[in-house]
Amino acid sequence: MSAIEQVSRPYAASFVEFARNRREVLCLSADLTNSVEIDDFKKVCPDRFISCGLSEQAMMGVAGGLAREGLLPYVHTFAVFVTRRPYDQVAMSIAYPNLRVHLMGFLPGLTTPGGVTHQAIDDIALMRVLPNMTVVDCGDATDVESVLDATEDVDGPVYCRILRGRVPRLFREPLELGRARVLESGDDVCLFTSSVCTGEAMPAVAALRAKGLSIGHVHVSTLKPFTDPAVLEAVGAARRGVISLENHLVTGGLGSSLAELMAEQAIGHRLVRMGLYDTYAHGGSLSYLLEYYGLSARHVVDAVERLTGERFGIELERAAESEGAPSTEKAEAL
């Protein structure tokens, strides 16, 4: 398997390129400018950079007011501080009036060693239930680089989970809103992944296919709306069952979206959900946390074996640093 390209700070460059000549775009920061890779924009366009300080609730109100005036605010902070802390303001000042505010959440799920205070493991669930909200979960550098263009014209609020630091490039084609990436097709089992779990799962899928299992692999970046016909087609084709793997609680995220879709379409396949089960996570490296909480490549193989009742004799490294994992370097702002 060829080495995976690692891209340094993909959001920093793409946001400057996207916003430089769009005078309506304003950049809001909650005192985490370097940590969410908007320091370059601050230097290039200081007149459109607004520092709101460590006051996320107020920042959401500011963003809503700017949007009412016809401007296009992009709010930047850690994912947990976009969702959990100012949730009422997001709901009442942004989602309820259906304003064009883009909420950019960094350090999603287990991608920080900062522990429970900094790990957004419930953010997709919180944002999915808000009427009018679009939800996107980036899985590689290409997703990060293209999410701004892909969501620019959404007529309402958008929440994006953004990877930072050194991020793997898994895909060449840009993200398309509402469209999943079908990485492999198969009619035995289909694995649906999102966020950093897609890169983690790739070696497992390759090993299983080499053993003769017809396993499909679909990367999902748009969690709401969840209406891509390709997802429904892949679910229907998987005669032995479906597996979801996500950097989030199993409640309210990708697994729940699949369960709802399958129930509504009367698809009676078994669904195995892999993610955090009714637990908060503790601090650690990404590779360690994926292993500890059962989200690593070898756990994907285990899940497929339980689902099919077969043994494939695949041995994958335990707790190895995944090539597809973003670094935990500078994982917390100090």
Q: Locations of the language-model features?
A:
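Thiamine diphosphate
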Residues: 1-161, 166-167, 179, 312, ...
